Every structure is written in structure tokens, then in C-alpha cells.
Design a protein with these regions (language model features):
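Membrane-cytosol interface at the C-terminal ends of specific transmembrane alpha-helices
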Residues: 102-104, 110-116, 122, 126, ...
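Cytoplasmic-entry segments and transmembrane alpha-helices of multi-pass inner-membrane transporters
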Residues: 31-39, 108-147, 183-184
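Short membrane-interfacial helix/loop motifs at transmembrane-helix boundaries
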Residues: 53-83, 250-255
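Interhelical loop and adjacent transmembrane-helix boundary motif
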Residues: 241-276
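Transmembrane alpha-helices
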Residues: 130, 184, 207-244
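Transmembrane alpha-helix signature in integral membrane proteins
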Residues: 2-17, 85-115
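Generic hydrophobic transmembrane alpha-helix motif, especially the helices
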Residues: 133-174
């Protein structure tokens, strides 16, 4: 009996050790399983992009060989019925339209994010932020209709041209990228430690100087991420641009002339491409 009593602590320790080893192996196995699952999904994501890219290159290579890369990229005329394919007007329209959207949307979005994060009353911020996020869920065709009945007539009646123009597309895209820029930039500003702002105040800086000289630079990476996402939205937008841009495959001489972007051209010529 004495020997058994002495063995109990050893047996309990051994049992706990075995249980711990089993639990450790099970945990490691679970982690490895999770890592394997993540790797599989990562490979699927990367592989999907690679397959799409390869498919586009392989399918488009014969057409590029027949048309000529130079004629395709730098041609100034697009007439699919006459087999004239020059996409330079669409490239320039997409670039200029995106730049216009950045000029309009980035300052407004950034200042709105700074206001909501650093200046606005908390109650007001709780009301405005969901309203801004709600704008991100509005369909593109609704934005396009708004541009068609508000922006286009305003440009036509007060500025110049028919209203359906590069300027209308830029203004509309600037409005559409606001929710993305505001939401991401505000999250980046909220993530800046409060001690940065308090330290600037302690050194004698006022509120505005502390925000623009300390908090905003500290959140610059997140702000740039929001701007990049907004630019991606502007470049890829199609339906709203089709409704307000004027649909002219010409290099615009001014911002009051109609244009056709690359994405709009893809959609409008899809029926012709399907018959090739």
C-alpha cells in the first residue's frame, strides 16, 4: 500500500503528460490543417487570376498579330464594322477620367474622414458614417441616373456642350469613390494611437496642426490604401460612365466633349465580339 501511495503522484504526472502530448499533437495537427486549407485557397485565388490572364493572352494573341500591337495600342480610330481597332482614345479617356475623379474625390473624401475622426461630435459622426457607408451599396445604375438627371443638365445649362462629357463622368466617378476613401481613411485615422495627438498638444501645437502634421502622416499608409481602392473603383466603373460620358470614340479636345472609356467599350462591343 505504501508503494502504491508513492506511485500515485508519478502516475498522475504521467497521465497529465500523456494528455498534454496528445493535446499538443492535436493542436499542431489542427494548425497544420488550417494552414493547408489557407494555402489551398490562396493557390486557388492566385491560380484563378493566372488562368484568366493566360486565357486573355492566348485568345487575344491571334487578333493582335493580325491587327498589329502598335496599331491596336496607338490607333486613334475604332470602327469594329470596318475592322479598325485603335484603343488609344479609350485609354486616354479612362486615364483622364480617373485623374478627374481623383482631383474631385480625394480631397473631399480625405477631409470628410478627418472631420468624422478628429473634429465631429460623436453623435454626428455616428449618423454620418453609416450614411457614407450606405452610399457604397447604391447600384451603379442609380448613380448613373443621378448623373443623367442632375450633373449632365447642370453642365449643359451652366457650362458648355451637351452635358454628356468627360467632365460629367469625372464628377460622377468622384462622387462614387467617396465612400471607399472616407471609410478606409477614417479607419486609418482612428487606428493612430491617441498619444501621438496628445504629444503634439503637449508640445504647444493647436488642434489643426496636431491633426494635419502628426495624425494624418501617421495614418498615411491607410489613407493611401483607401485612395488606391477608390482609383480601382473609378477605373473599373462601367454602367454609370456609359450613361453620362457621351459614348464617342474620339480623343477629346476638352473636358466638355463626349468620351468612351475602356470598360464602356468592352460592354458596348460585347455583342460584336460574341459573333467573331
Amino acid at each position: 500500500e505504501i508503494e502504491i501511495q508513492y506511485l500515485w503522484p508519478f502516475l498522475c504526472t504521467l497521465a497529465f503528460g500523456i494528455a498534454g502530448a496528445i493535446l499538443s499533437l492535436w493542436t499542431q495537427g489542427t494548425e497544420r490543417l488550417a494552414q493547408s486549407i489557407f494555402k489551398v485557397f490562396s493557390c486557388v485565388s492566385v491560380g484563378s487570376v493566372a488562368v484568366i490572364t493566360i486565357y486573355i493572352i492566348v485568345s487575344g494573341a491571334p487578333a493582335l498579330a493580325e491587327i498589329g500591337v502598335g496599331n491596336f495600342l496607338f490607333g486613334t480610330e475604332w470602327e469594329a464594322s470596318s475592322e479598325i481597332f485603335g484603343i488609344l482614345p479609350m485609354i486616354l479617356s479612362s486615364i483622364v477620367g480617373t485623374i478627374g475623379a481623383i482631383i474631385i474625390g480625394v480631397p473631399v473624401g480625405l477631409l470628410t474622414a478627418i472631420f468624422l475622426s478628429e473634429t465631429a461630435n460623436p453623435i454626428l459622426a455616428k449618423i454620418v458614417r453609416p450614411a457614407v457607408e450606405l452610399l457604397a451599396g447604391i447600384p451603379s445604375v442609380v448613380y448613373g441616373f443621378f448623373g443623367l438627371v442632375v450633373i449632365v443638365p447642370f453642365i449643359r445649362d451652366n457650362l458648355s456642350g451637351r452635358g454628356l462629357s468627360l467632365l460629367a463622368a469625372s464628377v460622377l466617378l468622384g462622387i462614387m469613390i467617396l465612400p471607399t476613401i472616407v471609410t478606409v481613411a477614417q479607419s486609418a485615422l482612428d487606428a493612430v494611437p491617441q498619444k501621438h495627438y496628445e504629444g503634439a498638444l503637449a508640445l504647444g501645437a493647436d488642434h489643426e496642426r496636431s491633426v494635419f502634421r502628426v495624425v494624418v502622416p501617421a495614418a498615411s499608409s491607410g489613407i493611401m490604401a483607401g485612395i488606391v481602392l477608390g482609383v480601382g473603383r473609378a477605373i473599373g466603373e462601367t454602367m454609370a460612365v456609359i450613361m453620362v460620358a457621351g459614348n464617342q470614340t474620339l480623343i477629346p479636345a476638352s473636358i466638355f466633349e463626349g468620351v468612351r472609356t475602356m470598360t464602356a467599350n468592352i460592354v458596348l462591343e460585347m455583342g460584336y465580339a460574341a459573333d467573331l
